[in-house]
Amino acid sequence: TGYGTDGTIWGGEILLADFDGFRRIGSIEPFLQAGGDLSAKEGWRIAVSLIWQISESKDEAMQIIRKLGLCEEKEAKVQLAMLERKINAVESTSAGRLFDGISAILGIRKKSSFEGEASMALEFAAEAYEKRSGEKKINVLDGQKCLTESADDGRELLQTSRLVRAAVEVVSNIGENAVAEDTFDQDLIEKAAYEFHKGLAEQIVTACIHAKEKTGCRTAALSG
């Protein structure tokens, strides 16, 4: 994660590169990263931003935040105000922060005491479901079924907001009382963590297949 050539925070990019340079041809959907350095440590802040992005109004966002028990009401109002007015908020396509936000939404980790803690906990939850359920590895061809769209600059956007909505729906369906008492149905949460990883992987595969079709490049290198 770091600042990209356009002054926004990058970290979930698909780059076409050679020894002479690179071109950004895809990314996860942008969201606002509000709260400065705290947003990198407190995943609930990213979760608030992701929820605000998929909501039709600030009231709807507040209702979801309250139902999920993400933070104190006062904190949520301050965070939403920053997002609405773009105060101390920068556009971001950081995959790491997306993972932190999903981890907070699912009630796995709302804050991190070290870099990557929330994302690691999300991964462990997904692995627990995979081991318990006997789910097989993802069939890469499934990626063709995922939807992507084009950004104004022509790059392909992975529709990560669909994954956010799915995570919110899982926790919302568990029930308000369970969230308030921190008694999440562990099986459902672990399955949701697995489905997030699977869904994102399928979207990445889709974008890579499209990139190969457009550019002829057949080599994919993963980093991060």
Summary of predicted features, one role per range:
Residues 1-55:
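Phosphate/diphosphate-binding loops
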Residues 3-5, 97, 108, 224:
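Gly/Ser/Thr-rich helix-start
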Residues 49-217:
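A contiguous, well-structured pocket-lining segment that forms one wall/lid of small-molecule binding clefts
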Residues 217-224:
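Glycine-rich phosphate-binding loops at beta-strand->alpha-helix junctions
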